[in-house]
Structure formats: structure tokens, C-alpha cells
Amino acid sequence: MQSLQHKASEWSGVLTSNAFAIDDTNLFEKLGLQTFISLSTNFYNRVYDDEEEWFHLIFANSDKQIAIQNQYEFLVQRMGGPPLYSQRRGHPALIARHRAFPVTHEAAERWLHHMQQAVDTSSDIDDDSKIKLMNFFRHTAYFIVAGIELKNQNFQMPCKNAPSPCKN
């Protein structure tokens, strides 16, 4: 079985080494807290204004302000800043936290479309950091897709001598 990282690289087109180039520089120190707050706000404004009903509905039961806070706190922590997300919410556990949502290839691409626009319109992010961030986002989006697909496959696997699928 392929690792989730390998599958994420295959589907995203981003090598793991490029996805984790974000670790070569402390992007939190370089860009600052406000940049991540602005990026997350810009991103979620785009998501909540999305004209595609199927995509917009994914977020229908989520509070926009909480989504913004969750994202910027995660990004601050992942990009080298203080562990804001973990202090408030515990381990990020990206796959588990996204399991309730229909995170498909199509949804990942739509999510990435909005993130690319948010990154591109941020004057506070230099070009090199934009590339690193988008490589990370693209790889991570498909890491989540792969993880959810794997969990769904395992959930449906029949148990030996059982009349119905096991619940793993």
C-alpha cells in the first residue's frame, strides 16, 4: 500500500520535498501574524461567496469566523509560530478533522482555487513564500483526500465471517 504522503504527491503533482520546503524558513517570523489572519480572512470570504452551490454547501454548517480562526491558528503554528491551534483545539489531526466533510478531488481543487486567489492577492507575501505556501497547500489538500479515501475504504471492508462491513 502506498503511503499517504506518496499518494498526496502523486495526486497533487507536488513532491514531498517541495511541499515541506515551508520548513526551510520560519514563515511565521518572515510574514507575521497579521499576514496569516488576512490570508485566512481573504480565503474564507471567497469560500463563503463561492457561486458553486455544491462547494458552498460544504461550509453551510460552519461558522465563518471560527473557520478563519482555526485556519490562521493552524497556519501560524505550522509555519513556525506559537502553537495557537493546539493550545485551543488539540492536535491538528487534519484527516480526522475533515472527515465529516465531502473532501473529494473536485472539492480539493475548488479549495485550492480560492487559496491560490487569496495567496496571489496578498501583497504581504513575497513570491518565494507564495510558491512554498501553495506547494504545501496543494500537497496537504491531497493528503487529506487520500486519508479520507483510505478511511472510507477501510470502513467498508467486510470483516471475516461478518454479515455486514466492519466499522473500523
Swiss-Prot record:
**An MF annotation (GO) of this entry:** oxygen binding
The induction text for this entry reads: Induced by ethylene and polyamines (PA) but repressed by gibberellic acid (GA) in roots. Repressed by cytokinins (CK, an equimolar mixture of kinetin and 6-benzyl-aminopurine) in nodules. Down-regulated under cold stress in seedlings roots.
| GO biological process annotation, one example | response to cold
Show the SUPFAM superfamilies listed in the entry: Globin-like (SSF46458)
Keyword Metal-binding on entry: yes
Per UniProt, the keywords (alphabetical) are: Heme, Iron, Metal-binding, Nodulation, Oxygen transport, Transport
Report the superkingdom from the record.
Answer: Eukaryota
List the InterPro entries: GlbO/GLB3-like, Globin-like_sf, Globin/Proto, Hemoglobin_trunc
| Pfam families, sorted | Bac_globin (PF01152)
Role played: Hemoglobin-like protein that exhibits an unusual concentration-independent binding of O(2) and CO. Required for general plant development and during nodulation. May promote shoot organogenesis from root explants.
Give the protein family: Belongs to the truncated hemoglobin family. Group II subfamily.
Oligomeric and partner information:
Homodimer when ferric.
Instruction: Spell out the protein name for this chain.
Output: Group 2 truncated hemoglobin 3-1
Q: Which gene encodes it?
A: GLB3-1
